[in-house]
Each structure stands twice: as structure tokens, then as C-alpha cells.
Swiss-Prot record:
Miscellaneous: Rate of quinone reduction is higher than reduction of azo substrates, suggesting the enzyme is better suited for carrying out quinone rather than azo reduction.
General function of this protein: Quinone reductase that provides resistance to thiol-specific stress caused by electrophilic quinones. Shows a preference for benzoquinones.
Record note on cofactor: Binds 1 FMN per subunit.
Pfam families: Flavodoxin_2
Listed name of the protein: FMN-dependent NAD(P)H:quinone oxidoreductase 1
Organism name: Pseudomonas aeruginosa (strain ATCC 15692 / DSM 22644 / CIP 104116 / JCM 14847 / LMG 12228 / 1C / PRS 101 / PAO1)
Length: 212
């Protein structure tokens, strides 16, 4: 049975194009795979807290088994979020591009799930850290909407895209290196160009859902 974790990052509800497109994929996936289980984590409309000094102290405690009750409480939400990730086979992230990057809620989610000794580890080689991801056998689908055009590979604005490339880096760091990106561009200008981009994204998502 497939297990999907859907993380929605847009602060908008029905007006969110990234959310709508991700739900197109999820509905088609459930239709093709009736036994699939979908869990949703809302980080756009219900933002997660930013990490604090207490969180950092607890997360990087040299002896995790000796964390105080207060430290354990500081990591409780992170532990829950990491558990949701470990319990999934496929991660679906829907996010708009905001100011060339992702909404703060999604950045906070990444900060909560990239955990030393939990989702990544490292060894020192002559004083240099060699990082090792701890997640295995997971895939990710990033569904994104962009206000302008040309932010994809080979586009004239590719260098300004710090959204899905950054997500690829963060996910790969913890072991999710099979990542597919589906984007709709031109939301701000709208019109036929944006409609065509959405239609193309929908068709690709439907094909991915049925072939997964």
C-alpha cells in the first residue's frame, strides 16, 4: 500500500494554484491506486514555528538519550513531522514561488525535519564533515506555481529560481534524491499563456499518477 505525505505550503486556500494542481495529482493517484493512504500537512495556512535557541540546543545535544524533559518538549513537533516523513513512500510538496524562493512555512518545515542523527548524519574525515543521508526508498513530487515565466531549466530567469532547486538540495541531503518537479508559470499575467501552462501541468500530473 502506497503512503503519501502531502505538504501544502501556500497560505491561500481555493485560490492557490499549486494546491489545486497537487490535489489533481492526489485524486488521480487515489483513483489509480485505491489502497493508497494520503496524509496532509498544512504549513501554509497553519505555519510552523521557526526554530529557536532551545530547539537548536536540544537537536544538537551530544548525547540525545540524556536530553532533559524540556529538551524533549522542544523537539516534540519536529519528532512528529519527521515521523510523518518516515511513514511515507511518496512526498508531495505543493508550493508557490515567493520572491524567488518558497513561503516561510515551508522553510520552517524543512528546518524541522532536517535533523542530525535522525534524517542525516556525518563523520569527520581529517576534520572535514562527510554527510550521510538517513532516509531510504522515498520519492518526492514538487508541484509549484510561478508568477512569471522562464524560471525552469534553460529559461531566461532560471538563475533567479531558488525554490524547487533549493528543495531538491534539502531533500537530497536527507536521502530523497528521486525528485520530480511539475510547474505552472505565468500566474501573475494570467490569460491564455497561464491556462496553457496549467493544462500542461495537469496532463503531466495525471500521467505521473497513473504510471506511479
Amino acid at each position: 500500500m502506497s503512503r503519501i505525505l502531502a505538504v501544502h505550503a501556500s497560505p491561500r486556500g481555493e485560490r492557490s494554484q499549486s494546491r489545486r494542481l497537487a490535489e489533481v495529482f492526489l485524486a488521480a493517484y487515489r483513483e489509480a491506486h485505491p489502497q493508497a493512504r494520503v496524509a496532509r500537512r498544512e504549513v501554509g495556512r497553519v505555519p510552523l514555528p521557526a526554530v529557536t535557541e532551545a530547539f537548536v540546543a536540544a537537536a544538537f545535544h551530544p548525547q540525545p538519550e540524556q536530553r532533559s524533559l524540556a529538551m524533549q518538549a522542544d523537539l516534540a513537533l519536529s519528532d512528529q513531522l519527521v515521523g510523518e516523513l518516515f511513514d511515507s513512500d511518496l512526498l508531495v510538496i505543493s508550493t508557490p514561488m515567493y520572491n524567488f524562493s518558497v513561503p516561510s512555512g515551508l522553510k520552517a518545515w524543512i528546518d524541522q525535519i532536517v535533523r542530525l542523527g535522525v534524517t542525516f548524519d556525518f563523520v569527520l574525515d581529517n576534520g572535514v564533515a562527510q554527510y550521510r543521508p538517513l532516509l531510504r526508498g522515498k520519492r518526492a513530487l514538487i508541484v509549484t506555481s510561478r508568477g512569471g515565466h522562464g524560471f525552469g531549466p534553460g529559461g531566461e530567469n532560471q538563475a533567479m529560481n531558488h525554490a524547487d532547486p533549493w528543495l531538491r538540495t534539502a531533500l537530497g541531503f536527507i536521502g530523497i534524491d528521486e525528485v520530480t518537479v511539475v510547474a505552472a508559470e505565468g500566474e501573475e499575467s494570467g490569460g491564455r499563456s497561464f491556462e496553457d501552462s496549467c493544462d500542461e501541468a495537469e496532463q503531466r500530473l495525471l500521467a505521473l499518477a497513473r504510471s506511479a
